Amino acid sequence: MHLRLNPDEPQIMHIDLNSAFATTEQQARPSLRGKPMGVTNRISKYCCIIAASYEAKALGIKVGMRFSEAQLICPEFIILESDPPKYNFVYQKLVKIMKAYSPKVEMKSIDEGIIDFSGTREVNSRSLQEIGYEIKQRLKDEVGCWMKINVGIGPNRFLAKQAAGWHKPNGLDTLDKTNLINYYKGIELTDLSGIALHYQARLNAAGIFTVLEFLKANPDFLHRQVFHSVVGRQWHQRLRGYEVDDTPAKLGQVGRQWVLGKSSRDDSYILPAFQYLCQTTGQKLRFNNVDARGVMVGLHLQSGEYWFKRKMHGSSFYTDQEVYRRALYLINQRPKSEAVIQISITCYELSPSARSQISLLDSTNRAEWLTQAVDEVNDKYGNFVICTANSITGRSLVKQKIPFGSTRYFELLLKEA
């Protein structure tokens, strides 16, 4: 069977600063090197780990695990609160190094990026492997000796990412037509980036149990029988090294969540923080130039229950006041006798903003003009120079979270740091 693998030379390099926040903290604090440690957004009884050092991962401590669970595995586990300016320093250094080799750089997250070498002079005279090793060394020279990155090289974004994860930590590998079949023989379906347990179940139900069987499957079969959408054909191309992932993903929702420092049912503690969450959610809407029609409020209760309410509105909104007004109506319906340990606010059903259109309603115009004026002042002098009194109280309670897995809000976050 002819598999029609992409015959082109690899032109995509994937850079992965794995365990980025934890490694950065170990670089900044030599006493932490070689020790199991992690980073959280705010230290509390219920806080979750957003980054774990290699030493912690080796013990079974994972991202998303609660601090209390990690302590059961390793009583000596060290937890630190996140430090955005520190991570921004490393992020900016990494971006600068990457752009020295090609203008076509795309950061997928704070700790992951892609260099597209197609059409660049650099690749004509030097191998990508040589450039990859040089980038590794430059990061050590320009940031610090403890910094390690994984480098993957491939003909498309997917295979470059797979290659970057092949030999962690500190690996450098290439996947292309010469070694792809042997690589696929040694991995499981869930080792493929994008194939989680639910997709594995679909593949298994269709009689596909190995990556090689996945590779050999007919594209029409994948489309109609397995994924029931064009996603099946995309996987057929992706596995062969053809590019299908160079289109930006559509933004589906924006929001915030907060793990309370202590469980509480007290409105005087909960609502100021909630208003701050709503205000920063409104900022995200405007930052992305979108309006929302739906809003959802979710609460994790001390009893272990999860409570939520959602509402779809006939008209779109984007101002902080409108986000808060709609969300307040929902949170006020919560079971007041139950103590809350975590709050989330989500705006969804997003559409490109129509706020540039002049409204016939004077009150709407006033709200829009006021929001624009406040944003302009805060952009110039720093976030929350102008804000509600409740938000001042709330901001002291809620630490802005590192936008793990995306660079979309990193610039917005640093205005507050």
Task: Give the role of each language-model region.
Residues 127-187, 354:
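Long, highly charged, low-complexity intrinsically disordered interaction regions
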Residues 315-417:
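Acidic, metal-coordinating catalytic segment for phosphate/diphosphate chemistry
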Residues 1-110, 114:
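Residues that scaffold, gate, or flank divalent-cation-dependent active/transport sites
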Residues 88, 92-149:
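Hydrophobic alpha-helical hairpins/lids featuring a short glycine-rich hinge
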Residues 5, 14, 201-340:
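DNA-contacting surface of Y-family translesion DNA polymerases
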Residues 24-27, 50-52, 159-167, 246-251:
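Short acidic, glycine/serine/threonine-rich loops at helix termini
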Residues 108-112, 146, 153-157, 290-294, ...:
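Short Gly/Ser/Thr- and Asp/Glu-enriched loop/turn motifs at secondary-structure junctions
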